[in-house]
């Protein structure tokens, strides 16, 4: 087999001296050239430690006959971008990273790549770039794991100081505590203490948000070594996993196996079934279709809805559950989930080990993986002074938390192309509700109304012009937390938007409303006092009346048509730069919100 790197080398006589200018030896030039791409940088805790794993992967490659080159595409942090216009760049920067990695890989041809990241947009961006290069190189993914939870002193535990779960502080709680402070419910000193200890280590945030979900998706797609997603970032096993990934990549290069030889539609269907079992972030409904698109497959939100129906939901991890995300690994991680739901998986799907998914699961049972996880869980039990069973974290298939997956796609005259709700994080009281519309054209106005008592039980808070072609589809996390942290609103008010939500979001929050307001979707036509009907089980979201008076479907159609005729249209505020490009070229959120 003639390596692609050697073919290009013969076409570019400057390549050899340029590489030797960085310390390559003459012998290095003829070795398989491997790209070790990461999002390392001081942008946030999910990327600030990745250089450790970069060096391990480089060593794994070099020790097994390759020559590794370090490349970087530092990502932004959605958490740091919350609450200001920086969050508008979030989805656009997924596209920017994908484009940068594609350019880096093609400008200097490589034979394989190790792709290392941790968080919300970096994980899908890496997977999208692998899809673009699916027939060009071998690929394997390493994640930066998950941060630790902080053990709070008893005086800071909420509600019950004896409850070990509440003593474990994780970042997604800060939005709630901030809203409590704004309402005068906790002092500034207490909020400061929470902030000081919410991120006690590097790694992805310790809840099943978008970062954790996408780490799990990478393993479920077969692109990671089994059992390596969501390891604690400080665990020595993660360093070993990075080294092993570099070594395994060299086997794939030698065998001529590319990512396109591994990932197929079975891989994506497996990932979606795992998503249902873990109650994964709703943002995966944009990321997985975007990744599939790059691999040449078409998946949309309806695929998720269909596969989630009847799926067993097993994972008791925050924000929908009780435990921090680090406990997922202690309970057996992705392999344990797959073992429980294997009757619903394609066990013949290929993976980067060179074996099928089914073969990987059998090997893990033989090599002591689960015993190792059990020992870690026992150690954690001892530390917090409470026995934790594996089934406290990952239920068995026969005793699930629920049997209808975790998300639903709703439709109706308000969302003809659909919208998404994470029903596992929604109070049952809100599964069927009649609400009064309270529309806002930006998140800041909505938050102000909530925090100052202008939103009441039975209201439906609308935030619009926040879709891909509007403001770039930012997260509405703070608005959701402002509602959920208020006991009078948490089970009586819905939040509906053409924007999206953080993976940490909880409560009756409905996002990705399509068509979006900027495209003239019905959400742009909602007026104060409209009657909104929500029915999760029937998958319906409708405008059924105006000013408190119900209308027939035909009457509502006529009213909406008249409003549309008077709609003044939308003019983007972005006149240059990345957000102009993204807002002009992004497809619907229901398709993946990628640029075309």
Identify what each model region corresponds to:
Residues 1-46, 55-73, 79, 85-90, ...:
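Catalytic or ion-coupling anion/metal-binding cores of large enzyme and transporter domains
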Residues 52:
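Acidic/charged coordination and interface sites in well-structured regions
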